[in-house]
């Protein structure tokens, strides 16, 4: 799946580079392996979203989608350098290992947050745009095809002879 993402766009390429860096770092570092497993699971879970974001950004040249792409790409590039620096540390350098572990955890949380929030905001914007288009289509259809009118008249008096219910169907065939 990562190979398909890399063929996609700039985000896909950055995501595949990060995925490869995480694989290499897992082989080198024993102390941060569990965090890297979690990061790899996060990458696997957001891969379909990144594919969608890449696909939609190619179709629509929108300034907001470009901003989202740029932020995600920078975040992924920073993560690649962070993971690679973590993998290069020696075992004895415990203080830096813990700092990198904390930074990788923060990155994972930030990545999930950015993807969740940006995707939700973009979905809300798309829904709003879709509602406006549907309203426009509805008004055009109302102009083309007038709706029939139903009238219901109910008359009731206390006397026995004045009870009546009348239904009228009117169509505007002008």
Swiss-Prot record:
It comes from the Eukaryota. It is a single-pass membrane protein. Its main location: membrane. Residues 68-145 form a coiled coil. The chain crosses the membrane at residues 7-23. Induction: Expressed in leaves after powdery mildew infection (e.g. Erysiphe cichoracearum UCSC1). Induced in seedlings by the beneficial symbiotic fungus Trichoderma atroviride. Keywords: Coiled coil, Hypersensitive response, Membrane, Plant defense, Transmembrane, Transmembrane helix. PROSITE patterns: RPW8. It is found in: Membrane. It holds the Pfam family RPW8. Residues 1-153 form the RPW8 domain. GO terms for biological process: defense response to fungus; innate immune response; plant-type hypersensitive response; response to fungus; response to symbiotic fungus. The keyword Ribonucleoprotein does not apply. The keyword Transmembrane applies. One of its GO terms (cellular component) is membrane. Ecotypes susceptible to Erysiphe cichoracearum, such as cv. Columbia, are lacking RPW8.1 and RPW8.2 but contain in place HR4. Disease resistance (R) protein that induces localized, salicylic acid-dependent defenses. Confers resistance to powdery mildew (e.g. Erysiphe cichoracearum UCSC1). Belongs to the plant RPW8 protein family. This is Protein RESISTANCE TO POWDERY MILDEW 8.2. It comes from Arabidopsis thaliana. The lineage of its organism: Eukaryota, Viridiplantae, Streptophyta, Embryophyta, Tracheophyta.
